[in-house]
Amino acid sequence: LRDEDKIKIFIIVDNTSYRNDFESAWGLSLYVEAYKHSFLFDTGPDPGVFRRNLERADIDLRSIDFVVISHCHKDHTGGLEYIAEKRPGLQIYIPDESRRHYIQEIGLRPSVIKDLTKISENIFITKPLEGPPIEQSLVIKNDDKMILLAGCSHPGITNIVREAVYMFRKSPEIIIGGLHLFNVSTERVKEIVEELISIGVKKIFPIHCSGEKTREYIKTNYPEIYGDGGAGMIIEL
């Protein structure tokens, strides 16, 4: 599966299911293969759904190099105990101190991110931003494209994208993740989507807490920008 030219993102946990054999749950977990690395971005709300969907995806945790936690809410950290059981000592990148002790106690190795952090030549964790809670995102980039993975966008997705532009001197073309727009008006969704497009975003996969209203708005008004989601879906870029 590790093709250096391909970036593969497998949605393990999401609020909806793309494949009938995958369970849905309010939460997020993405399995990523990119540039000789395989890793998890968030771990869903509980060990059970996380474990069963990983099994359905035929993903062996022994192949995982590290885990990035976007923020320390339960619907993104629920699978950590299962990871600890299978991969004790695995590196877990977190955006603040709030779960450091817990992560150490269950036998994993937490690293608190304070600023833009380069994991490899093409993989970066962004500087954590205040939400609340404090949240970090992940960027995968090469000469052609830049992909931003967002957990819940508590700091605001436009703020996250503008910070990425500041850090990398270019806009992410692709956003995959929770936009935290499930409880805002259609007018607000319109403003945010249009701002993202004006910054330079070309494709949005509005999963997890983005809201049905957001998905429908993008799909109806900007079908070329909309990307589908749901547990069991594979995005290849």
Question: PLM ranges: what are they?
Answer:
Residues 4-12, 118-125:
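N-terminal amphipathic/basic leader segments beginning at the initiator methionine
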Residues 37-39, 65-66, 88-91, 145-147, ...:
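Short active-site oxyanion
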Residues 48-93, 168-174, 194-197:
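Active-site metal-binding motif and surrounding structural segment of the metallo-beta-lactamase
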Residues 57, 88, 106, 200, ...:
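Short, structured coil segments at secondary-structure junctions
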Residues 94-137, 142-143, 227-237:
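Metallo-beta-lactamase
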